[in-house]
Amino acid sequence: MLRLKDVHAGYGKAVVLHGISLEVRDQEVVALVGPNGAGKTTTLRCITGEVPLVGGEVEYNDKNISGTLVQDVVSFGISCSPEGRNVFGNLTVYENLRMGGFLVKDRALIAERIDWIFSLFPRLAERRSQLAESLSGGEQQMLAIGRAVMSGPSLLLLDEPSLGVAPVIVDAIYEKIVEISKAGAAVLVVEQNVGLALDIAARAYVMESGEIHLSGPSAELLSDSYILDTYLGVK
C-alpha cells in the first residue's frame, strides 16, 4: 500500500530526513515512534505532500505520489489527523464532521459515516450540536480523528493522538484506532509514547535524528533491550 523509499526531505536548506524507508500494508496498524524532533511529523508531511522531497520517493498503491499537491492526496484515499487536533472551533461537532466529508457527494453515505463515527465515539454524539472549542482536549482529539475518517480513507495518518489528552481518554482513543483498522483502513500512527503505540501496532519503526534506528514486529521491539532502557524505563 504505502512505501517510502530512501526519502530525504527538510525545510529550505535544512535536510531533516536522511534516507527514510518504511512500509504500511493493507489494514495494518504501524507505529512510527521516537523522541520529539526525530522527524516523525516531517515524515507524515512528506506523505501528504506538505514537505517536498529532495531525494527518494513516496509510493502509494504502486504509484509514485512524490510531489503530489496536498489537496489531491485525499482523493487517493489518504487522510491525516494532524498534531494539535486543529478542529474548527467555531463550528459544531456535526459541522466539523461534515467538513471532513467535503469530497463525498453521496448524502446518504455522509450520514452513514457520521452515524458510524458517533457509534465509535458516543461522546461526540452527545455533543453533536456543541461548538468544537467547548470540547475537552480528549473530545477534540476524537473529533479530529472522526473528521479524518469522514473521507473514507484506505490509509489514516495519526500524528500524536495522545498529546495533551488525559490517560484514561488516551486508552479509549487507542481502542478506537484498532476498531478503525478492523473496519478497513490501514493506520500509520506517530507517537512519542512508545509503549502505547507498540501495544496496538503490528509493526513499528523507531526514528531518531531523522533516521530509522530500529524496526520490526512490535512484540519483538517490546522486548528489545534498547527500547526497554531508552523508552520504557526498564533497566
Segments from the language model and where they lie:
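Conserved ABC transporter NBD signature motif
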Residues: 56-65, 76, 109-114
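Conserved ABC ATPase signature
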Residues: 131-135, 139
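ABC ATPase C-loop
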Residues: 148-149
